[in-house]
């Protein structure tokens, strides 16, 4: 099985790649959900740091608890199943086996952080209660009688082996029709990508997609409801944010990573489809549903949006001044040359 994943910088069009690949008969698409368990806070990457790179008898156990908490959150609930629905109800089971394999031993006990991790009230109230017990010489009295402390200090080799076994088990369940290729959206980050390849025994290829900041800005201000994810107090702050998220992921020279622009998939479709196929190893004859998911004649409406919105003209000028190296050269392309299926649909989406 060969894994394909996309990474972006928020709203930069990486779904165009997942849409394109879902048109191939040899690809199992997973383009309805993002799987970030490797690089999200308290995910696998953080777990390795605390268990292997910066081991501490108390912090490492806490890291396992935090990872376990993330696993439970990702698995979902009865009314919002999240990961479980995609992993055939086995995500939690496979993850618990992974945690068990990383745990050397465990015992009933706790330390101050276990109190603080509950709430400020718990930290102070239970802390006082614990001191009273100590002064009274209360036998076997504990404010957290069911709390478990995990002890784990694997070698890096053991951690990587366990993690590769873990990710492979998850991917096998996810690829339920045993296709040669499988798309897993946002599996790896756009920064420090290379360090995460070692977590997989399967071959992994990554597309990192970027987009003209002027269009991203207009979409941030007008279309997207996730306004808590980006600054909107001033265009200057927004430009700082745009540059910030890219500077955290300087371009990485690795044969398993392909950088591309969203706009190139629209204006230079045939050229870039060929590049994508070559990069992954796809056979063009397997492209059996062209333009059903990625239709350049439709997706072109998601480009040059800033030219159709006059409300933010002054902001666009400021973006052109502050972020010149990220601008796409729209003057060099012609919409009349765009290929695809004819459509009457217009407007951004």
Functional labels for PLM-detected ranges:
Residues 1-4, 89-93, 98-102, 106-119, ...:
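PAPS-dependent sulfotransferases, especially Golgi type II membrane carbohydrate sulfotransferases
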Residues 2-7, 12, 157-177, 187-195, ...:
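PAPS-dependent sulfotransferase catalytic domain
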Residues 49-60, 227-237, 305-314:
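A polyampholytic, Gly/Pro-enriched intrinsically disordered region
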């Amino acid at each position: 099985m060969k894994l394909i994943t996309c990474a972006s910088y928020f709203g930069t069009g990486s779904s165009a790649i997942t849409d394109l690949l879902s048109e191939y008969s040899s690809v199992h698409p997973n383009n309805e959900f993002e799987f970030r368990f490797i690089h999200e806070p308290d995910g696998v990457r953080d777990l390795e740091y605390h268990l292997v790179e910066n081991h501490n008898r108390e912090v490492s156990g806490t890291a396992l608890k935090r990872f376990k908490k993330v696993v439970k959150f990702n698995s979902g609930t009865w009314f919002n199943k999240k990961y479980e629905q995609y992993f055939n109800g086995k995500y939690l089971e496979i993850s618990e086996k992974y945690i068990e394999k990383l745990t050397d031993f465990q015992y009933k006990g706790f330390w101050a952080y276990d109190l603080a991790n509950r709430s400020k009230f718990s930290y102070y109230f239970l802390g006082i209660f614990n001191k009273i017990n100590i002064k009274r010489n209360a036998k076997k009295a504990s404010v957290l009688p069911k709390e478990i402390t995990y002890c784990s200090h694997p070698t890096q080799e053991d951690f990587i082996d366990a993690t590769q076994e873990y990710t492979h088990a998850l991917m096998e369940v996810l690829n339920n029709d045993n296709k040669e290729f499988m798309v897993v959206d946002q599996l790896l980050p756009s920064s420090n990508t290379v360090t995460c390849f070692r977590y997989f025994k399967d071959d992994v290829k990554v597309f990192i997609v970027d987009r003209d900041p002027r269009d991203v800005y207009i979409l941030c201000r007008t279309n997207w409801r996730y306004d808590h994810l980006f600054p909107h107090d001033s265009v200057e702050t927004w430009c700082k944010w745009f540059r910030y998220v890219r500077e955290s992921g300087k371009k990485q020279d690795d044969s398993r990573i392909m950088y591309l622009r969203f706009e190139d998939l629209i204006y230079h479709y045939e050229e870039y489809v060929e590049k994508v196929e070559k990069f992954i190893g796809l056979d063009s004859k397997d492209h059996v549903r062209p333009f059903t998911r990625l239709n350049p004649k439709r997706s072109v409406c998601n480009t040059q949006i800033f030219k159709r919105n006059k409300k933010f003209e002054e902001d666009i000028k400021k973006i052109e001044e502050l972020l010149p190296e990220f601008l796409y050269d729209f003057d060099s392309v012609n919409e009349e040359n765009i290929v695809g299926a004819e459509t009457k649909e217009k407007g951004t989406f």
